[in-house]
C-alpha cells in the first residue's frame, strides 16, 4: 500500500478537508502492515474504495423563525460504507458542521460499527443549523424541514439515523413525527434514539457514557489498575458527558471537573447525583454555559473562564465533547499533573500530537471508535427490538452492552498487543474494524 500516493490523491480531490484527511491518515498508518499481508485486498483496491463515501446527499433546509423570517441552512447525509449492514450513524446540528466533518465522522463510524459485532454500515449527517438560543418551536420547525428533504433516502434496511451533538430525544421525536407524516406509515425502525414509549430502547440516552466507562474499566484491568477511587476530568456537559459522569460515579470514581466552551467547573469533592441531573437541564437550556453549574452549586463548584478540563489535576481524562478538543499542549499539561489514562469518548477527541504525546509517555490511551461505541451499539439493539416488535428491560440491554464493550476490548487487544505486552488500542481498534469491513467488501465483489 502506497500511503503517500493514496493521501496525495485524496488531498487533491478534497482540499481543505482537514478532519476527514486526519481520520484517514491515522487509519492507514495503523493498518499498513496487516494490509500488505493480503494481496487480495490490493488487487480489489479495498483501501481506495473504503476511504471514499458511497454517496453524499446535500440539500437546502428552509424554515421560518419565531419572528416570521425565512431562514436557510445546509443539510447533509453521508452514506459512507454499507458493506456489513444498513448505513448507521447520527445527525449533528452545529454551526461548525461541514462536509469534511461529516465525512470524517462517517469514516470513523464505519470502523466503530464494525467493532460492535452488530450488522451496521457507517453513515453520518447533520446541518450547520445552530440550536443554541433557538426556541422549542423553532427547533421543531427546523427538524420538520430537515426531514422533508431527508426522508426519501432513509429506512430501516437502508439508512438509520440517530442523534449526535445538538440532536437528542426531543429532536428525534420531531424528526420521526415528520417522517411518519411524509411516509404515511408508522415505521419505528427508521430512526434510533426514540422515546422509550414509542419504540426506543431503555438505556439508549446513557449508552455512550456507560459503554465508555465499561471499556475504560477493561483498559485499567488489563493494565493491573482499577477505576474505583480514581479522579476523573471530563469535557462537555451534554448527553455523553452526563452518562459518563453518572456511570463513573456509580463505579466509585470521583468526577472533579466538567467543562464547556466558556471554561471549566472544578469540583474538588466530586460531582454529586444532583449535579449530574442538572447537567441535562444545562444542556436543555441551550445556553451552552458550564458556568451555570457553579452558579447553581457555588459551595461545590468553582468556575474558571477560558480554561479546559485538562487544567485540573486528575488520574483519568475523558474527552466527551468535540473532535480535536485535546491538543498536544493539553496532553503535556495532563501528564505534568499526574494523569495516567486518557480514553476518548468524543469522536477523534485528541489531536495526533496529543495521541503521540500520550503514547510516548506510556500513558494508557484508547480511541473514540472503541471507547464510545456503546452508543451505536444500543442503537443497534434498538433496531433489533424494533425489527422483532419487542422491548427489552434495562437489565437486558445493560447486559448486552457489557458483552459488546468486552468484545470490542478483546478485539483491540488481539490486534493491538505489542511484544512488551502493552496494548496499542489505536492500532488494535483500527485493524479489527478494517478487517471486518474489508473482508465483507472482498466477498461482495467490485461494487
What are the roles of these predicted feature ranges?
Residues 2-23, 219, 333-447:
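Adenosine-phosphate binding glycine-rich loop
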Amino acid at each position: 500500500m502506497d500511503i503517500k500516493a493514496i493521501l496525495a490523491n485524496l488531498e487533491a480531490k478534497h482540499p481543505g478537508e482537514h478532519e476527514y484527511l486526519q481520520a484517514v491518515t491515522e487509519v492507514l498508518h495503523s493498518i499498513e502492515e496487516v494490509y500488505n499481508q493480503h494481496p487480495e485486498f490490493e488487487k480489489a483496491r479495498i483501501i481506495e474504495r473504503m476511504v471514499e463515501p458511497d454517496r453524499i446527499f446535500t440539500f437546502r433546509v428552509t424554515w421560518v423563525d419565531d419572528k416570521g423570517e425565512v431562514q436557510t441552512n445546509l443539510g447533509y447525509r453521508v452514506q459512507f460504507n454499507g458493506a456489513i449492514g444498513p448505513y448507521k450513524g447520527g445527525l449533528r446540528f452545529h454551526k461548525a458542521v461541514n462536509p469534511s466533518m461529516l465525512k470524517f465522522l462517517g469514516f470513523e463510524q464505519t470502523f466503530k460499527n464494525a467493532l460492535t459485532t452488530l450488522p451496521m454500515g457507517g453513515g453520518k449527517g447533520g446541518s450547520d443549523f445552530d440550536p443554541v438560543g433557538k426556541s422549542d418551536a423553532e427547533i421543531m420547525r427546523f427538524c420538520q424541514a430537515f426531514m422533508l428533504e431527508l426522508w426519501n433516502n432513509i429506512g430501516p434496511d437502508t439508512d438509520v439515523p440517530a442523534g449526535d451533538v445538538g440532536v437528542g430525544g426531543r429532536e428525534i421525536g420531531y424528526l420521526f413525527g415528520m417522517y411518519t407524516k411524509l411516509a404515511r406509515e408508522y415505521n419505528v425502525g427508521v430512526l434510533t434514539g426514540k422515546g422509550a414509549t414509542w419504540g426506543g430502547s431503555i438505556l439508549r440516552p446513557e449508552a455512550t457514557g456507560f459503554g465508555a466507562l465499561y471499556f475504560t474499566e477493561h483498559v485499567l484491568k488489563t493494565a493491573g489498575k482499577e477505576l474505583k477511587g480514581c479522579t476523573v476530568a471530563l469535557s462537555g456537559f451534554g448527553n455523553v458527558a452526563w452518562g459518563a459522569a453518572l456511570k463513573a460515579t456509580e463505579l466509585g470514581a470521583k468526577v472533579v471537573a466538567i467543562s464547556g466552551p466558556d471554561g471549566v467547573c472544578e469540583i474538588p469533592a466530586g460531582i454529586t447525583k444532583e449535579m449530574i441531573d442538572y447537567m441535562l437541564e444545562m444542556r436543555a437550556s441551550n445556553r451552552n454555559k458550564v458556568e451555570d453549574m457553579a452558579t447553581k452549586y457555588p459551595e461545590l463548584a468553582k468556575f474558571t473562564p477560558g480554561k479546559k478540563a485538562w487544567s485540573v489535576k486528575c488520574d483519568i481524562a475523558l474527552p466527551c465533547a468535540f473532535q480535536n478538543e485535546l491538543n498536544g499542549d493539553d496532553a503535556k499539561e495532563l501528564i505534568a499533573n499526574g494523569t495516567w489514562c486518557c480514553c476518548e469518548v468524543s469522536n477523534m477527541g485528541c489531536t495526533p500530537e496529543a495521541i503521540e504525546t500520550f503514547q510516548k509517555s506510556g500513558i494508557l490511551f484508547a480511541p473514540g471508535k472503541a471507547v464510545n461505541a456503546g452508543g451505536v451499539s444500543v442503537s443497534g439493539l434498538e433496531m433489533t427490538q424494533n425489527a422483532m416488535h419487542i422491548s427489552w428491560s434495562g437489565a437486558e440491554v445493560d447486559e448486552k452492552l457489557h458483552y459488546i464493550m468486552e468484545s470490542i476490548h478483546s478485539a483491540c487487544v488481539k490486534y493491538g498487543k505489542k511484544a512488551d505486552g502493552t496494548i496499542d488500542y489505536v492500532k488494535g481498534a483500527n485493524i479489527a474494524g478494517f478487517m471486518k469491513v474489508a473482508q465483507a467488501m472482498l466477498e461482495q465483489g467490485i461494487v
